[in-house]
Amino acid sequence: MRLARPLENLIDQLLKLPGIGPKTAQRLALYILKLPEMEARQLAQAIVDCRQKVFPCSRCGYLTDFDPCLICSDESRDKSLICIGEESSDVIAIERTGFRGQYFVLNKDFNLMEDKGLEDLNLKPLEDRLATGEIKEVVLALNPDMDGEVMSRFLATVAGSFGVKVTRLAHGLPVGGDIEFADEITLRRALEGRKEL
């Protein structure tokens, strides 16, 4: 069935978003069409505003609308502890845990298995912060996939060259998960990271 061209275009644009399949894109497009015109314009303007006014903090890379960001500007944070994540969404997730250190966000799509991404990383702000001697520990909070492993080793070498302690998030079984369904790597990491009770 043929759809109106503007509707097809909206669906095609929504399909470019992560996690949005054809049915969800169509459902969202039809929902947007039902919005009062003012709300539809506000949605469109919010997207334009984000593209124009949100940028990576020059100090940590977290997405912000002023520089330095609120996290870097917060004097109550532990400046001796820095957590390195892949994306701003990682910072948002870690912030929910009550983490009180600071951050560095890579903000790069890297596929190290295909030699893509390492040369594009801007690590100068991180190296400048490490060089001050104020940072005592770097926590690597990278995804537990092959690229995350390679990047973790690379960043551990970079941070280690400044004499700081380098740790990484523990890997293991999710809360509510069944051991029988866990893969060998997850189980091995859970065993290696076990703690005394």
Curated annotation (Swiss-Prot):
Matching entries from CDD domains are given as:
TOPRIM_recR
What's the domain of life for this entry? Bacteria
Xref: Pfam families: RecR_C, RecR_HhH, RecR_ZnF, Toprim_4
Q: Where is the Toprim domain?
A: 80-174
Single GO term (MF): DNA binding
Query: Which GO BP terms, alphabetically?
Result: DNA recombination; DNA repair
Q: Which sequence ranges does the entry mark as zinc finger (C4-type)?
A: 57-72
Known InterPro entries for this protein? DNA_Rcmb_RecR, Hlx-hairpin-Hlx_DNA-bd_motif, Rcmb_RecR, Rcmb_RecR_Znf, TOPRIM_dom, TOPRIM_RecR
Keyword annotations from UniProtKB, A to Z: DNA damage, DNA recombination, DNA repair, Metal-binding, Zinc, Zinc-finger
Listed SUPFAM superfamilies: Recombination protein RecR
Stretches of the chain forming a coiled coil according to its record: none
Function according to Swiss-Prot or TrEMBL:
May play a role in DNA repair. It seems to be involved in an RecBC-independent recombinational process of DNA repair. It may act with RecF and RecO.
Q: Into which family does the record put it?
A: Belongs to the RecR family.
Q: What is this protein called?
A: Recombination protein RecR
The organism's lineage is: Bacteria, Bacillati, Bacillota, Clostridia, Eubacteriales
Gene (UniProt)? recR
